[in-house]
Amino acid sequence: MFSIFSCGATAPKNVVLGQARQSFLYLEKKVVLEQCGDHRCLKQELNSMASGFVIKATPDGSYGITAAHVCDTSLPQTSTPIKHVSTYTVTSLMGDEYKAVVLASDIKNDICLIYIKGLINIPVIKISNTEPKPGDTVYNIGAPRGIYQPNMVPMFEGVYNGKASLYAFYSLPANPGSSGSMILNEKGELVGVLHSVYVKFPQVVLSARYDVIHEFIRKNIIKYETYKSVMSVLELKDVFAAHKL
């Protein structure tokens, strides 16, 4: 059994949230686009933000989880090729900045694994050993609309509604910027990763199903641990790109 999976007991809400918020990550993505044609080049910079959290820490850095659409770098096909470079900056709860790389991404289920070199000695979010049941109380810690400051991140309480098809449904408030944020049970264990919200009713959100999240993290942590002793983080980025789900 991996140490990233939990068998903890329920603690008071303020204790659970106080510990979990230490694992929060604020993500900023910058994409530089360049398209050349007719003897001229056009360049544009796109910026976006999202949420994430630490799932495992090592002596050299930490693994983080966010939504796959945050990690996606695909572009529509055009008659003139578009060059693009994406960079990710991660800020911890206390305001320390790091660079991150994408290791694995499951677009279908909208979940992504990143690696943050140098982010050490940080609490991690454990994964629940059991999936939630409809009616269970859940907590969400994220940065809707980019609402975040050092040592301040919004926290919400909601309810698990059930699952259908690829999705798990939760009653929680969300907005752009909430993508990739943790959904926890009352023990502070991971049960969901928020990736979508109903635009006309932003109090109902979607996550990948618990079993999908559980397997994605388990499988990709194993892959990373297998390769990391002989390859650099940048080389690993290429390895995982060849093993996308």
What are these regions (language model features)?
Residues A11-N14, Q35-A67, Y98, G180, ...:
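A conserved glycine-rich beta-strand in the N-terminal activation segment of trypsin-fold
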Residues G18-R40, V138-N140:
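A short, Trp-centered hydrophobic/proline-enriched beta-strand micro-motif
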Residues K30-V32, A57-P59, A67-C71, L93-D96, ...:
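Solvent-exposed coil/turn segments that connect beta secondary-structure elements
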Residues C7-A9:
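N-terminal Sec signal peptide cleavage junction
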Residues N47-M49, I55-I107:
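Catalytic-histidine neighborhood of serine endopeptidases
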Residues A11-L17, V85, I122, L190-L245:
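C-terminal cap/linker of serine protease catalytic domains
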Residues P12-V15, I122-S178, L194-V205:
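Flexible, gly/ser-rich surface segments that form the specificity/activation loops bordering the active-site cleft
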Residues F53, P173-L194:
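Catalytic nucleophile loop of clan PA
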